């Protein structure tokens, strides 16, 4: 397995010590080479692979600056149990953010003085408070409380929509005119934008056709010109 390899360097220390032990001239000190002491501490390896020494990580001395308290005067983040519930509700119902809300409060504790056991008073943020009441008072899980409060919210929205439709029908029976709704206004704006784009597209198409016709005419002219020159030379 080790045929053709030289291992004489593995016994260089023994050879050097043996050479220094026998002196030709008596009463003289042998000249010790400088590398002999280093070779005594770090002898040559007896295997063909170099051993990898164990790496010891020294503890990092960060100094006294690391022991000082940080963010001592920074205010802590205020977290309420309703925050996560509110985030989940508005993630599932993003259009509720577009509805007008009553933001006028006395001291910011109006929601705590309400009796949430009697159902929803104002949809939206009230769904979160109703869900929290189910979790704290009734002991329901988070998903179950959200499901119950959400169904109450849908039922209340359906009642409001039915009342609104009935009121509009009754008013129209007495001759009231409400004008265009949001859907009709949006369709008119969309039609106007489409007609404007149609005019622009027609102009662009005519420009492209004119450029294509002009390019074809130039190619025909360059092909017919040499033929006319040949006829003139023959004449």
From Swiss-Prot:
Its main location: mitochondrion. The keyword Mitochondrion applies. Pfam families: MRP-S25. Disulfide bonds: none annotated. InterPro entries: Ribosomal_mS23_fun (IPR016939). GO terms for cellular component: mitochondrial small ribosomal subunit. Keywords: Mitochondrion, Ribonucleoprotein, Ribosomal protein. It comes from the Eukaryota. It is found in: Mitochondrion. CDD domains: At1g26750. Residues 51-71 are annotated as: Disordered. GO terms for molecular function: structural constituent of ribosome. PANTHER family: 37S RIBOSOMAL PROTEIN S25, MITOCHONDRIAL (PTHR37799), SMALL RIBOSOMAL SUBUNIT PROTEIN MS23 (PTHR37799:SF1). Component of the mitochondrial small ribosomal subunit. Belongs to the mitochondrion-specific ribosomal protein mS23 family. This is Small ribosomal subunit protein mS23. It comes from Chaetomium globosum (strain ATCC 6205 / CBS 148.51 / DSM 1962 / NBRC 6347 / NRRL 1970). The lineage of its organism: Eukaryota, Fungi, Dikarya, Ascomycota, Pezizomycotina. The gene is RSM25.
């Amino acid at each position: 397995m080790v045929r053709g390899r030289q291992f004489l360097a593995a016994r260089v220390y023994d050879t050097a010590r043996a050479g220094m032990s026998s002196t030709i001239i008596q009463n003289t000190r042998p000249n010790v080479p400088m590398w002999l002491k280093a070779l005594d501490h770090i002898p040559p390896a007896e295997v063909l692979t170099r051993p990898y020494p164990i790496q010891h990580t020294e503890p990092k001395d960060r100094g006294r600056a690391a022991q000082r308290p940080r963010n001592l005067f920074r205010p802590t983040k205020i977290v309420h149990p309703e925050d996560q519930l509110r985030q989940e509700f508005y993630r599932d119902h993003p259009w509720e953010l577009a509805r007008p809300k009553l933001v006028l409060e006395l001291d910011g504790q109006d929601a705590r003085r309400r009796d949430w056991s009697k159902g929803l008073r104002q949809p939206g943020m009230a769904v979160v408070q109703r869900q929290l009441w189910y979790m704290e008072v009734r002991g329901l899980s988070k998903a179950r409380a959200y499901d119950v409060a959400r169904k109450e919210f849908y039922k209340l929205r359906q009642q409001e929509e039915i009342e609104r439709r009935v009121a509009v029908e009754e008013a129209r029976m007495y001759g009231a005119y409400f004008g265009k709704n949001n859907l009709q206004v949006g369709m008119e704006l969309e039609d106007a934008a489409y007609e404007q784009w149609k005019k622009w597209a027609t102009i662009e198409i005519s420009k492209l056709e004119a450029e294509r016709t002009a390019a074809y005419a130039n190619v025909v002219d360059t092909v017919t010109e040499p033929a006319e020159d040949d006829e003139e030379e023959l004449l």
